[in-house]
Amino acid sequence: IDGHPQYAGIFGHPIADAYQTLLADRVEVLRGPASVLYGSNAMGGVVNIVTRKMHEDGIRTHLHTGYGSYNTLETELTNRIRKGRFSSVISGSYNRTDGHRADMGFEQYGGYGRIGYEVTDHWNLRADVNVTHFNASYPGPVSAPLLDGDQRITRGMTSFAVENEYGKTSGALSFFYNWGDHWINDGYTPSAGEGPQDDRFNSYDDMMGISWYQSARFFKDNRITVG
C-alpha cells in the first residue's frame, strides 16, 4: 500500500481480507523485480494499492451499499475534503455474509483516515491509518464438516511521508508501521471422533520501516530511480 510492504511477519504473506476498496484510488501492477522500491520480497513483481486523495477543492461524500444472496451485505461510506493546501479522507465500511453452507459466516469492520498538506508547490506531507477487523468461520469439506473453525483477526497500518514533485523529478521519504493480532481456532471434525480443541492459536506481529526513493525523467519513455 503506497509502496509499503504489507505481509504479516508470522505468515510471510499479506492477509487479503484486511484490504478493502475504501483504500484504493488505483491499483498498480508491476511485472518483474522491483526490490529497489519495494524491498527484498518484490522479486517477481508487485501489486501496489495507491490510497485515495482529493485532487480539487470541494467536499465529496460517497455511499455504497449492496445486498445479495446468502444474506450478503456490503456497505461503505467515504468523505473527502480539499480546501487550499489541506486535504483529508475518512472512510468506514461493514461487510458480512452467511456463506453458502452452515458455519461459513464472514463479518468485517474497517476504517481508514488520511490527511495531507501541501507545504509548497513542490513539497507535501501526508499521514494515514487503516484498521480492519474480521471474523470468519471455515466449515471444512462437505464430506467431513468442521465445527468451531473460527478466526478473529485485527490488522492495521499507519504511515507518514514527505513527498516532492518537480516535473522531471519526484520522490518521497516515508515511515511506516504495520501490526496484526490473530486468534484462530483450528476446529474439530466430529465424524472423525474428534472433540473441541483445548487451545487456540494466538499471535501478534508488527513491522516497521523507512522507504526512500527519487525518480528522474531525462527524455521521453525513460525513468531512472534510486532508493
Where in the sequence are the language-model features?
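Residue-level signature of outer-membrane beta-barrel architecture
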Residues: 81-83, 117, 162-166, 206, ...
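Transmembrane beta-strands of outer-membrane beta-barrel proteins
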Residues: 61-63, 88-90, 125-127, 171-175, ...
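Short strand-turn segments of transmembrane beta-barrel domains in outer membranes
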Residues: 34, 46, 51-81, 91-92, ...
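Outer-membrane beta-barrel channels and translocator barrels
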Residues: 56, 83-86, 120-122, 132, ...
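N-terminal secretion/transport leader regions
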Residues: 27-29, 47-49, 162
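Short acidic/polar hinge/loop motifs at secondary-structure boundaries
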Residues: 4-31
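Flexible loop and strand-edge segments within Gram-negative outer membrane beta-barrel domains
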Residues: 97-104, 108, 124-207
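Hydrophobic, lipid-facing positions within transmembrane beta-strands of outer-membrane proteins
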Residues: 43-45, 59-63, 73-77, 109-113, ...
